Amino acid sequence: MGQVHLHNRSFNKATSAGFLIALGIVYGDIGTSPLYAMQAIVRGQGGLANLSESFILGAVSLVIWTLTLITTVKYVLIALKADNHHEGGIFSLFTLVRRMRKWLIVPAMIGGATLLADGALTPAVTVTSAIEGLRGVTHVYSNQTTVMVTTLIILAFLFLIQRFGASLVGRLFGPIMFIWFGFLGVSGLINSFLDLSILKAINPYYAIHLLFSPENKAGFFILGSIFLVTTGAEALYSDLGHVGRGNIYVSWPFVKICIILSYCGQGAWLLAHRGEHIEKLNPFFAVLPDNMVIYVVILSTLAAIIASQALISGSFTLVSEAIRLKLLPLFKIYYPGQTLGQLYIPAVNFALWVTTSFFVLYFKTSEHMEAAYSLAITITMLMTTTLLTYFLIQKGTPKIAIAFISIGLFCIEGSFFAASLVQFINGAYIVVLIALAIIFVMFIWNKSHKIVMKYIKSLNINEYKNQLNALRHDESYDLYQTNVVYLTSKMDHEWIDRSILYSILDKRPKRAECYWFVNVKVTDEPYTSEYKVDMMDTDFIVRVNLYLGFRMRQEVPRYLRTIVTDLMESGRLPRQHQHYSITPGRKVGDFRFVVVEEKLMNARQMPGFERFVLQTKAQIKRITASPIRWFGLQFSEVTVETVPLVLSDVRNLEIHERLEQVDETEAPATN
């Protein structure tokens, strides 16, 4: 859920309001894991009848220390310090370290893709797990179809309201999650009194012992189920900019205590009832009195919806960052909220809705979804650790500390990844295939941009200033527009895309009073909004470099209005008097934006792989948004022109005139 990014003085500060906001945004995923994590652990052992005291203590101990080592140590104590001007997440981390090694784009792409794929499964498993609590309400629950239909209706409603923004209901998220965590803590504490020996689980001995114990039927692979307790840790880092480091530091101890108490309460209940035969057991709901189940189902459903909303909003943010980093194609982006960061991407919303609904229909139960859940997020965490290692190197952290942290995290997360591999055949392959598809698109888009930059030819604009000056005074040509603006992807000092000058001078001479060449540069800082102007020693050629952060909207006309006003007030740009206008004394003329698109020709000199990449990109572009909407040009006068990408490879086809008389019957006539 988008929020206004925080200023320096408030980023490290904790407030009561910030505490509630953090509960509503950051902890939805990790806070709903008690709904299904212990259920997966019990099922992996073969059910309640097969549980021993040492197994239960070991399982709860693994839960406690997984939350401690992964969430607390890695994310809260280490990753939160790796902020990019107060923003977190894998792409923010990548922008901090991408200049250290070119290949670091690989873990960034893999981590981003698996995080997006995981975001499609999380709403399905959390909402389904909550609704399955109805199994304990006989007059409501009839069969699993009831759960599936209810889940699909809730998800449909959730995705349909995205276009209106989350701000209307977002203010309720914090108080609801406060009640949710309070319930987890209180109910867990009460149930812990069923068998206080559960407190032994704090000792890591029981966790280590269980991994090698013959009583553990799943063996090492139990870690695949254990990892479910910390799948939301990555979201904690991604939402850093939304709530601030101070609020996370204060709220996480409260959240962690409540979650651990919930697991301890479930563990104590299992100790008190071990040896019993209960089918389709979910300890989370089993610990409740019958008359409370329906109310807890409602509360857990609200918590699941909030967790899903946070992941959906996070997916929008992740995609928008990938677009600005040239890792994904352009998609239509809307900003339904009034605060910076609230955005809505219809294509992503629809894809998530379809994929999430498919997961509900395909897996049917939360038990089956859990089997596919954790593999993708373990990959994301490994990629984050890779980037985090280079961040520590960049910051000058002592080598021994880097080695200790990195090797430790790689060993722990590598173990979870290896244990989760067994889930591949149980459904995780679907999530992996989705992630691979996203990685493929990212690779094509990023690689194609590099190829295009290689083939685009540049010309020195100084050599054409006289022609442009002559053209603007040549009244034999109609005035094309007072101001003609070209958006260029490549502009280096006085060098400019050949295709742009080709459009102005060759394709159809475009007479104008002023020629603008605008290049948008995405900065490593998230919220930069600056510009640099070069008049090229003229008053009719303006080169503009827009420096926009990777989380800023690239709405060129809005920025250009400010730049024009600044230039005229400083006397660098002549005033453009308008005789006809509804605005008295208007000093700025009309504008036309020209978007030049390079199209791939059948370039014989281009290697086959490069041709494949560009042809694939062309097919992908057919289903994505145009630059017109991306750059905010939909309400401006716009001309889209097409030029061949490889101008240097255009050759004249050889053909010779036949001198002898040709019989008219030799060739059919064409009309």
UniProtKB/Swiss-Prot annotation:
Primary subcellular site in the record, as a coarse category: membrane
Keyword line: Cell membrane, Ion transport, Membrane, Potassium, Potassium transport, Symport, Transmembrane, Transmembrane helix, Transport
Swiss-Prot/TrEMBL catalytic activity: K(+)(in) + H(+)(in) = K(+)(out) + H(+)(out)
Database matches in PANTHER family: K+ POTASSIUM TRANSPORTER, OSMOTIC STRESS POTASSIUM TRANSPORTER
InterPro entries: K+_transporter, K_trans_C, K_trans_N, Kup
Protein name in UniProt: Probable potassium transport system protein Kup 2
Homology family: Belongs to the HAK/KUP transporter (TC 2.A.72) family.
Species assigned in the record: Lactococcus lactis subsp. cremoris (strain MG1363)
Gene that this sequence comes from: kup2
GO MF, any single term: potassium ion transmembrane transporter activity
Taxonomic classification: Bacteria, Bacillati, Bacillota, Bacilli, Lactobacillales
HAMAP family listed in its UniProt record: Kup
Topology of the protein relative to the lipid bilayer: Multi-pass membrane protein
